[in-house]
């Protein structure tokens, strides 16, 4: 009897001492076969801790790069590179950084991990949505440059006495920018008792009207630990898959309502089981970065991980 694709992937993983890391926004079938699921910070830490020879990263381009930066000696593969470029990660190129560095020469630059390796190499420190406020508050400066997500910068500004300068103007995630206050009113009218959980990449107006603002790992923790039964989830719809998987493991049932059903990151959905199998079989789409970029970007990420 021929093996099914999941069995074949598991066999290849074992043969090659490979590990599969998948972001919370990945399709459900990918989440189910991953060795580790998580948000950007959790996956950064897992990538650093793994003793596998090969890391297969199911996410978008900057995530694979981050895994390579933290594991320069390991082989980091992505099942797909065509169409997996996170648009926001490319909104803060070196020339924009140069302009703001000249305007604010004393201000440290904090960049979201949702950036390219080149951008991280120019930063003083990186952050994720799970630790952005802690990272900014750890810096010995009154003013910080923060990019590329303007909504995350707003979230941080509300939690620090420092002046946060959001760069570039209008930077952000196209998925989270879809959510509006009208969406919230519409869904809330149908589920008046539901708690509203949103990601800090959502607009200031939504942040000001949410019960909780959290990274995807924070959203998971709140849903699992809360006594509440209904939640409106304001982030990419793949997160609902992750929540359902974890609730099922605990034998719990809760009502999870997407703030918008079309909140889909198309770049995250490019990965399939077939592509993972081919990636392991051929060891294709390896992430390669210049040594100098790796060394500089590593300093910025390592500094974050020490906080």
Curated annotation (Swiss-Prot):
One of its GO terms (cellular component) is cytoplasm. Binds 1 [4Fe-4S] cluster per subunit. Keywords: 4Fe-4S, Cytoplasm, Iron, Iron-sulfur, Metal-binding, Pyridine nucleotide biosynthesis, Transferase. One of its GO terms (molecular function) is quinolinate synthetase A activity. SUPFAM superfamilies: NadA-like. Its EC number is 2.5.1.72. Pathway: Cofactor biosynthesis; NAD(+) biosynthesis; quinolinate from iminoaspartate: step 1/1. It is found in: Cytoplasm. Gene3D superfamilies: NadA-like. Iminosuccinate binds at residues 23, 40, 112-114, 129, 199-201, 216. PANTHER family: QUINOLINATE SYNTHASE, CHLOROPLASTIC (PTHR30573:SF0), QUINOLINATE SYNTHETASE A (PTHR30573). HAMAP family: NadA_type2 (MF_00568). Catalyzes the condensation of iminoaspartate with dihydroxyacetone phosphate to form quinolinate. This is Quinolinate synthase. The gene is nadA.
């Amino acid at each position: 009897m021929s093996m099914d694709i999941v069995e074949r992937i598991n066999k290849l993983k074992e043969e090659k001492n490979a590990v599969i890391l998948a972001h919370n926004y990945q399709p459900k079938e990918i989440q189910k076969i991953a060795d580790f699921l998580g948000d950007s910070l959790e996956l950064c830490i897992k990538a650093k801790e793994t003793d596998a020879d090969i890391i297969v990263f199911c996410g978008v381009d900057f995530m694979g790069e981050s895994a390579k930066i933290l594991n320069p000696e390991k082989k980091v593969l992505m099942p797909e590179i065509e169409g997996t470029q996170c648009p926001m990660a490319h909104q803060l190129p070196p020339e924009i950084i140069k302009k703001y560095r000249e305007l604010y020469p004393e201000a440290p630059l904090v960049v979201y991990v949702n950036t390219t390796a080149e951008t991280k190499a120019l930063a003083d420190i990186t952050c994720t949505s799970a630790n952005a406020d802690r990272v900014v508050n750890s810096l010995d400066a009154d003013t910080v440059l923060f990019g590329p997500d303007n909504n995350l910068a707003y979230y941080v500004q509300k939690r620090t006495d420092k002046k946060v300068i959001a760069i570039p103007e209008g930077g952000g995630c196209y998925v989270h920018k879809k959510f509006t206050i009208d969406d919230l009113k519409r869904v809330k009218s149908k589920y008046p008792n539901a708690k509203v959980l949103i990601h800090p990449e959502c607009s200031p107006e939504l942040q000001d009207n949410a019960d909780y603002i959290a990274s995807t790992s924070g959203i998971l923790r709140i849903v699992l630990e809360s006594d509440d039964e209904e939640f409106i989830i304001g982030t990419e719809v793949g997160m609902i898959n992750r929540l359902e998987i974890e609730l099922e493991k605990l034998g719990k049932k809760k009502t999870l309502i997407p703030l918008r059903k079309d909140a889909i990151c198309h770049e995250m959905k490019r990965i399939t089981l077939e592509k993972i199998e081919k990636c392991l079989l051929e060891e294709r789409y390896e992430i390669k970065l210049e040594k100098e970029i790796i060394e500089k970007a590593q300093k910025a990420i390592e500094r974050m991980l020490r906080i």
